[in-house]
Structures are given as C-alpha cells and as structure tokens.
Swiss-Prot record:
Oligomeric form and interacting partners: Homotrimer. Trimer pore size is 0.6 nM.
Any one cellular-component term (Gene Ontology): pore complex
InterPro entries: Porin_dom_sf (IPR023614), Porin_O/P (IPR010870)
Entry's localization field: Cell outer membrane
Keyword Transmembrane belongs to the record: yes
UniProt protein name: Porin P
Signal sequence segment: 1-29
Alphabetized UniProt keyword annotations: Cell outer membrane, Chloride, Ion transport, Membrane, Porin, Signal, Transmembrane, Transmembrane beta strand, Transport
Topology in the lipid bilayer: Multi-pass membrane protein
Function, in words: Anion specific, the binding site has higher affinity for phosphate than chloride ions. Porin O has a higher affinity for polyphosphates (tripolyphosphate and pyrophosphate) while porin P has a higher affinity for orthophosphate.
Entry similarity comment: Belongs to the OprO/OprP family.
Keyword Ion transport recorded: yes
Main location as per UniProt: membrane
Protein source organism: Pseudomonas aeruginosa (strain ATCC 15692 / DSM 22644 / CIP 104116 / JCM 14847 / LMG 12228 / 1C / PRS 101 / PAO1)
Amino acid sequence: MIRRHSCKGVGSSVAWSLLGLAISAQSLAGTVTTDGADIVIKTKGGLEVATTDKEFSFKLGGRLQADYGRFDGYYTNNGNTADAAYFRRAYLEFGGTAYRDWKYQINYDLSRNVGNDSAGYFDEASVTYTGFNPVNLKFGRFYTDFGLEKATSSKWVTALERNLTYDIADWVNDNVGTGIQASSVVGGMAFLSGSVFSENNNDTDGDSVKRYNLRGVFAPLHEPGNVVHLGLQYAYRDLEDSAVDTRIRPRMGMRGVSTNGGNDAGSNGNRGLFGGSSAVEGLWKDDSVWGLEGAWALGAFSAQAEYLRRTVKAERDREDLKASGYYAQLAYTLTGEPRLYKLDGAKFDTIKPENKEIGAWELFYRYDSIKVEDDNIVVDSATREVGDAKGKTHTLGVNWYANEAVKVSANYVKAKTDKISNANGDDSGDGLVMRLQYVF
C-alpha cells in the first residue's frame, strides 16, 4: 500500500515520491510475479525496474560533483588568490525502455550549470528509436556528437574539466536546441553518427540556425585494456543574417573563475577574450570546424589526443576568425585496472576497482594548446595585444575510485598565455581544484 503525503510545492512532492519509491524498492528488490510479464527490481547503483520480456524498463539515477578550487595569476583580474566552491553538476537522471524499441532519457541539472530559465536546466531530454537495427535515431535535446572526450560521460573523463580545444568552438558539441541524430555500430569495429540540430538562435526571418555534425570512428580493438581508436569529425552552421555570439573565452581549465552552482571568483574571475565578437546581426557568413581524435590503451595505460580547427567566415568588411588547438593525455592506473571502453558511442567509460578496500588509483598528465587568429583586433588593449592569442595548460592529476559510486579527484593546472593577460598584466597562473563525486 502506498500512502500519499501532502507537501508544499511540486518539487517537494516529487522528491517525497521518489524517496518513497526508493525505500519501497529496497524492500522489494528481486523478481515480482504479476499476471503479465514478471518484474525485476534492482537497487544497486540507483533504482532500476524492468519486465523480464524487456518490453519496459526505467532507471532512476544521478550524479553529484562537488568542487573546490584555488587559483591566482592569470585566473584572477588582479592576480591575487581567489577560490570557488560549487556543484559542478547535480543531475537527476531518469531513463528506460518502452515497447522494446523506444528508449528515453531525461537528465535535469539542479546545479543550473546547464540550460537557462526559459529553456529549463535539461542536460538531456531525448527519445531514441532502435527498431531500425543497427541504426539508432535520437530525437530531442542532447549533446551533438563531436570528439572523444565529449562522448565520454562527465562522470568518467580523466581530468575534472574537458580539454581546451572545445573552448574555441563550444557550439560543436553542446545541447542548446533540439535535433535528430542517426548513429550506428558498423561491422563490430566502427562507429558512425550524423545529426541535424536546430540551435536557439534565429536569422532575421525567424528561421533557426541549423547545425550539421558528422563523426566517424574506426576502433578495430575495443576491449578493456586493449583499445585502438581513430576518429574524424566535422561540424558546420550557416550564420548568414544571424546574430550569434562567436566570442572565444576559455576558462583555461579552471571552472571556478566563472560558474553557477555555488560561489565562484565573482568579479575578480578572469575569462580572457581571445577573439570573436558578441551577438551582432550580419557579421558572419558561416562557421565550420573539423577535428581528429585518437586513443590507445594497453592494460592499465592509456593515451589519447585530439586536434580541432575552426574557421568563421566574415560577411561584411571584416577578417575571418580562425582558431586551432590540440591536447595530448597520458594516464596510468597504479592498481592495474583498465579503462572500460564502449564501441557504441566510441568512448571511454569508468574504471572499476578490483580491490574493494583500497579502490583504484589513477595518475594522469595532460598538455593543452590553443591559438586564436582574429585580425579584426587592430589596436592593443589593456588585456589583449594585436596578433595571434595563444594559451597552454599543463594538468597533473590523481583520481581515486573508492568504489563504483564514489570518485575523489585532485588536479593541478598551470596556465600560460601569449598576447593576452589579466588586468594586472599577468600571463601565467596556477590553480588547484578538487572534487568529490557520487553517482547512483
């Protein structure tokens, strides 16, 4: 028997309902016999309910990432030390299957680092049709496919923040809008995806900006601890008669300089403008990005790298905006466990600790480098000199997978820039950020 609780507010009612469902499920975990298909209830790693005939299922899960960082130099406007304490992500995730061939996924970000007040704080809200096997069709709001690190869940990326190359073309794999994507595993050794996405930007006729993405990955070896991964991707959008923000303002690997979800560095946080402009109608013709990705894993060791190049063609009497970047990363699990890998999606997954007492310990190093060429900047300013702006970071980190639900991380980041500085004239900075993650 389920009792109804009276709570003030819809959010409170939902929270109590989910709590009651979870508590009830703990006592009912196992197989439940019904007059139709039997129901299997699992409570390890969230709440999962499914029929034995696999026609219907749902799973309630989530992730919580609590970060704390301290940083100075380039990362702050005056060069002095600032700190930030915030929830990087706080997702409630609900997904499952309906009538076997339909999959659904809804992820809502309670930290408000995804989305906005008008569109909702949805990380994802999508429906996937799998009846055209091996091709899957996804509809709704989701992250368009571009890049190995973006394909990998934020729960299991090695560094706390993804590589800098995504900051020079942040639209290629974001989720701002709605669209359709077709994807497929090919021949048991490759993954292909293509999407058309309607962005939340319009031209003068009210027609939304359309984004087109293609990604192809060849992975003849794709077992845990034995991975060879080579990929190519391309993204394009038509910006004619549109007002689109093309500013390139990387955080240089330190989210706390400017973030939601808690307390950031406030007005002293520095996000330098490397190039581009605010949303002004008619400045740009189109925007195209292509990239390369590669990875190799052997036992507890893994290496990966990506390269990205962007060209924004000018519409008026302006110069084109060009940007490029790359990163290279090495990681090693001291306790011997390999990184898991999924060919469907062409992405790395978690590290599962073999020793329940000490967990799994991973060390890594990553080098990032970006360059932005904006010849529309013809006069030096207090923080930006004429010429190509460059940025690079060295990131050294450790991840402790205490168990399959808890992950503790610490990253040290050293940044260096050229042709761009903070208001104090600093072109280098240091930062330390830590995270406690819980997933269910």
